[in-house]
Each structure stands twice: as structure tokens, then as C-alpha cells.
């Protein structure tokens, strides 16, 4: 979950990639791992997403830090309370191997990868860099406002906003 990286670190990463090195980029519009709890047990959102805008722009990659992937086909069933019944959560997806690049060593032996509040990447128009997606969503997916998914206590509400775009996202 890259945040507030120094100019020196950003430069080192950029030089590695520009010299032919590869980078695997995972970006997080909602930093779920940084959520804390108040003394009363209430969730306090971190309010911070990943930020690599300078590098992504230079590499010809687009990322919307205010959007998360919502996928109806791959939605995980979650229990939001101890006594609640499991229900699909569009912002939490379990991606099986058929959505992976089976030719790449990084993903070829994986079975399933789970994501919560996943960011989405795309290649910029006119980009000259090579953009090789390793994991894709289903086509029954859309981009949803990150603020709507953040701190969600009733995932059924997401279905009110969901309109599949017929697009597979990276």
C-alpha cells in the first residue's frame, strides 16, 4: 500500500522499470488494513488510498484512486455480524484461476486471490510501455465510488448502485 514515498524512492523505482525491470503494482483506493477501532469498537476509516500517480503517469498507466472494483460474478459471501447471514459483497471479490494470466510465472500456479476494495489499472491512450495484466475481473463488473464501499456495514446497499458495464477490469 504505497503512500508518501520520497522522491528518491520514486526515482529508484522508475529507474528500475525504465532499465527494463518489471513492476507488479497493487493499489488500494480504500486502505482496509489501516482501519482502526475506537475504544467503543466503532470502525474508524483510514481515509487513505495508495498513491503512485507520478510513476503511473510516466509509465502510461491510469488509476482512479476514488474508484473500486465491484464484481457481481466474483463477489465473496461475507457475514457482516456474528449472527448475520452470509451475503455477497460486490466490493470483496474472490478471483479464480481462469481470470489469471496462466502463462506468467507469478500467477500460473495460483488458485484464487481475494481482494477487498481493489483498485483498477488501465493503459493510457498512446502509452508506449508494455502493459501485461496478470489478473482480470469478470465482465459482470463496474467501477464504484470508493467512499460508498468504505466502512460498508450492509453490502446489500451496493446492489442498488450496481450496473454492470460489460467490461473486464485489470
What are these regions (language model features)?
Residues 1-170:
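Acidic, S/T/G-rich, low-cysteine, solvent-exposed domains in lumenal/extracellular/periplasmic regions
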Amino acid at each position: 500500500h504505497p503512500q508518501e514515498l520520497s522522491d528518491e524512492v520514486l526515482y529508484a523505482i522508475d529507474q528500475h522499470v525504465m532499465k527494463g525491470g518489471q513492476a507488479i503494482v497493487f493499489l488500494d483506493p480504500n486502505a482496509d488494513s489501516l482501519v482502526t477501532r475506537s475504544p467503543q469498537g466503532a470502525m474508524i476509516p483510514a481515509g487513505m488510498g495508495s498513491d503512485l500517480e507520478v510513476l503511473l503517469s510516466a509509465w502510461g498507466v491510469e488509476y482512479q484512486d476514488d474508484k473500486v472494483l465491484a464484481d457481481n460474478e466474483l463477489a465473496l459471501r461475507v457475514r457482516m455480524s456474528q449472527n448475520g447471514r452470509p451475503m455477497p459483497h460486490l466490493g470483496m471479490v474472490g478471483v479464480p484461476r481462469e481470470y489469471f494470466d496462466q502463462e506468467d510465472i507469478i500467477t500460473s500456479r495460483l488458485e484464487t486471490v481475494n481482494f477487498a476494495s481493489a483498485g483498477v489499472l488501465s493503459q493510457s491512450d498512446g502509452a508506449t510501455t508494455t502493459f501485461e495484466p496478470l489478473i482480470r475481473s469478470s465482465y459482470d463488473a463496474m467501477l464504484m465510488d470508493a467512499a460508498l464501499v468504505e466502512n460498508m456495514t450492509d453490502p446489500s446497499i451496493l446492489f442498488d448502485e450496481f450496473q454492470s458495464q460489460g467490461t473486464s477490469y485489470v
